[in-house]
Amino acid sequence: MEKLIIAVDGTSSSGKSVIFKKVARILNYQFVDTGLMYRAFTWYCLSKNIDINNQNQIIKLLDSFDYKISNDQVFVNNTNVTNKLTSSEILNAINKITIIPQIRNYMVKAQQQMVKNKGYILVGRDITSVVLPNADLKIYLDCDIEIRAKRRFEQNVENKILDKSFKQIYQDLIKRDQVDKTRKIGPLVLVSDAWYIDNSYLTIDQVVDIVVNKVHQLESQK
């Protein structure tokens, strides 16, 4: 059976990464969190000690930037940077980089090139609408915002991250949704041919099962 190209968009903290990493393992597909590509490039820019406000210097670094993903590990120019991509330094700098059209175009083309051999699941905010509009399967994952905030808060407590209250997380998600859905370049949208999944009252494994079954069904029709 021929494998598929699967595009996934969805709201922040709706479980996209944890769910579709599991789906990818079961199906023996390659999982790509496209947001990590932007984080990896941001790390690369910071590692070169350039002026992060100088767009020309940032754009020039694209010529020497090499990104690879293997077994959930992220490599930049053969350096494993997986554990360096969640630093506050990167999170503070990334918005100055993602707004640059040339960076955006580079990433979209790289992501499109990546899936030419099929057997890929790409997750992001505008994958179904911009990056892979012709994907074999498009999915929009959503969840009630209060439930998203509750899950994130409980996850933080479990990991002993106590810097934000439930209310703060809830307010952050409201702002994040607004930013994602109204950004000028690549806003989060529900495209007409996407399969809408609301996982507010489903477990991770329940969503994984229905997606895997759907993929098997589509593969058998190829």
From Swiss-Prot:
Signal peptide: none
Keywords per UniProt: ATP-binding, Cytoplasm, Kinase, Nucleotide-binding, Transferase
GO BP annotations listed: pyrimidine nucleotide metabolic process
Reactions it catalyzes: CMP + ATP = CDP + ADP; dCMP + ATP = dCDP + ADP
Pfam families in the record: Cytidylate_kin (PF02224)
Parts of the chain that traverse the membrane: none
Binding site for ATP: 10-18
InterPro entries, per the entry: Cytidylate_kin, Cytidylate_kinase_dom, P-loop_NTPase
Name of the coding gene: cmk
Protein name: Cytidylate kinase
Family the entry assigns: Belongs to the cytidylate kinase family. Type 1 subfamily.
NCBIfam families: cmk
A Gene Ontology cellular-component term: cytoplasm
One annotated GO molecular function: CMP kinase activity
Superkingdom, taxonomy of origin: Bacteria
Entry EC number(s): 2.7.4.25
Enzyme class: transferase
Compartment(s) of residence: Cytoplasm
